Structures are given as C-alpha cells and as structure tokens.
C-alpha cells in the first residue's frame, strides 16, 4: 500500500519511518495553498491512502506568513476530492469542551462540569454552580497550554486570579470542576468491519511525579522529569474505562480514532475531561504520548492500528460517496 503522510512538520522533527517500514510511503510537509497541493498529490496517482497528522501551521517569520494554514483546511480538501484519509473528518475535527460536555450529558456519560468564561465578572457568577477545587484552563486546553500548578484553585480568590490571567492571554478560559483522583487515557479506533462498534485499546493510567496531580506545562514538556504511563490491568476498571471511552466516541460521532482523558474520583466514578479526535501518534520512544503506549499495549501494535485506520479510510470514502 502506498501511503502519503500529510504533516505540518519536517522529517528532521517528525520521522515516522520506524512505524511505516511495512509500507511504501512518502511524507509531505504541507504549506499553503493546501487545497491545490492536495489536489496535485491526488492527481499524481502515487498514493493509495493519506495518513493525515496535520495540526495546522503558523510560520513565525512574517515573510513566510502566507504559507500558514488551519488544519481543518486539510480535511476539507481531502473530503472535497473524496480521498481515503485517516483521522477526524470535518464533522468532529475540533469540538469545544462545551460541545463535548453537552453531548456527554445528553448521553449519560460522566463529564467534568464547567463553563467557558470571558471575564472575571462572568466567572464570579458561574463559579457558584461548580464544586471546589476548580481548574482554570485554556478555552481549548490543548497540550496543557497555559496550565500551571496554580491552575488548580481552592478558593474564589484563586479562581478569579487564574481566570484573569488566562482570559487576558487567550481571550477566554475554561473553568471546570477538578476531579481529585487518578487520571487515565482511553484510545478508541474505528472498526472497519463494523463501523458502529469501534475497537478500544487497553487503557493507560498516568503516573504523575511526586507532588503532582495533573499535567501542566512545567512537567509535560520537561523530559528530565520522571513521568510514566501504566497499562490498566484490573479487569473491572479496564472494562469501565473502555466502555466510557467507547460511548463518548460514539456519541461524538468521531471518525478514525480518538483519545479520551478521564479522571476517577475516590468513589470510583469516571469523568471525561475531553475526547481528542487528533491525538499525537508515532512519536519517538523518548517522547511517547499516551496513544503510542496504548497502541503498543495491544498484541498487534502499530501494525494492527494501521490496518484498522487504513481500512476505515476506504470504508468511510465509500460511505461519503453513497
């Protein structure tokens, strides 16, 4: 199978070669204009499937600013040409936390309650509906952006201080109940043989450094700080996590694959923090993310993962044209 890897990174910074050794593949670092370049790739006839890992790109150099693009442009171009591609489609590409929360509530899936707020005054009113402790995050909270140890607030004064900081930097803040307890990840992937019944990988538990209880900028990107993941092997907990992840994946209508971040309180109740329809994959061993670990927990590893998402890409291509 001939695979085109669509990325916004250069091969020096992101090299999927160790994972794709069983395929004939080429990596294309996309720059704008995206639609024209994807059309040219399609018309070349060189590829059978497109492995899309683009997150969008903004060039810092003003001279290259016109080369930047939004990641949704890549998906839109792939869909417009009805090409077989992996990952999220335009229906579920970048949902807000509030959209996730609404869908979870409507489907009886536990979700960390919260609000998007745009000012200290708004936060002061809405915080009355939340239970402490409270976490103040970037409104989209990707990559732990803008999160620090002080992002956990135990008093109203702390909440308002953090809301002011985050809103001033990002224009809004996600203010939500912090679930004291353990944190887990659940990876759910399309089952091409039964698209309504996705496959769920063995979940992972996050093992935080001593004195830490959640991911934040100071520890997430410092590879000198000991941080680990552990496969969940307790049968009952494993089944509960897989079931909640699967239900959230289905309720959100995720295509391809998605990673749920889940907290468990002292009562054993599960609360999803988010479902990421574009989780990082194929990272280098020293930088493995949760999706990499969970894929490798499975006996078929990345071979099984690629088999599922490539077959799903063709299946969804047929569904779009039906």
Predicted regions mapped to residue ranges:
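ATP-dependent carboxylate activation and anion-phosphoryl transfer catalytic cores
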Residues: 234-322
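Active-site nucleotide/adenylate-binding loops and adjacent lid/helix of ATP-dependent enzymes
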Residues: 1-6, 41-44, 90-176, 180-181, ...
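Short glycine-rich anion-binding loops that position phosphate/pyrophosphate groups of nucleotides
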Residues: 11, 55-57, 139-141
């Amino acid at each position: 199978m001939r695979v085109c890897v669509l990325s916004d990174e250069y091969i020096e910074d992101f090299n999927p070669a160790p994972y794709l050794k069983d395929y004939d593949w080429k990596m294309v670092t996309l720059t704008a204009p995206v639609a024209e370049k994807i059309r040219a790739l399609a018309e070349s006839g060189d590829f059978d499937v497109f492995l899309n890992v683009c997150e969008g790109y903004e060039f810092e150099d003003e001279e290259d600013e016109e080369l930047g693009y939004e990641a949704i442009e890549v998906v839109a171009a792939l869909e417009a040409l009805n090409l077989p591609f992996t990952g999220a489609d335009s229906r579920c590409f970048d949902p807000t936390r509030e959209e996730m929360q609404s869908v979870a509530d409507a489907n009886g899936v536990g979700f960390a309650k919260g609000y998007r707020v745009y000012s200290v005054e708004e936060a002061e009113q809405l915080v009355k509906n939340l239970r402490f402790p409270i976490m103040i995050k970037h409104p989209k909270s990707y990559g732990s952006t803008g999160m620090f140890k002080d992002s956990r607030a135990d008093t109203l004064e702390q909440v308002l201080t953090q809301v002011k900081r985050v809103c001033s930097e990002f224009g809004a803040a996600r203010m939500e109940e912090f679930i004291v307890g353990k944190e887990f990840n659940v990876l759910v992937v399309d089952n091409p043989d039964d698209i309504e019944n996705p496959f769920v990988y063995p979940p992972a538990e996050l093992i935080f450094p001593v004195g830490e209880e959640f991911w934040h900028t100071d520890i997430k990107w410092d590879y000198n700080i000991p941080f680990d993941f552990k496969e969940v092997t307790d049968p009952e907990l494993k089944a509960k996590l897989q079931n909640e992840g699967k239900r959230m994946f289905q309720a959100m209508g995720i295509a391809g694959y998605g990673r749920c971040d889940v907290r468990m309180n002292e009562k054993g109740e599960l609360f999803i923090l988010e479902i990421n329809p574009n989780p990082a994959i194929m990272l280098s061993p020293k930088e493995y993310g949760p999706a990499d670990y969970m894929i490798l927990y499975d006996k078929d590893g990345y071979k099984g993962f690629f088999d599922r998402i490539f077959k799903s890409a063709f299946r969804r291509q047929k569904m779009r044209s039906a």
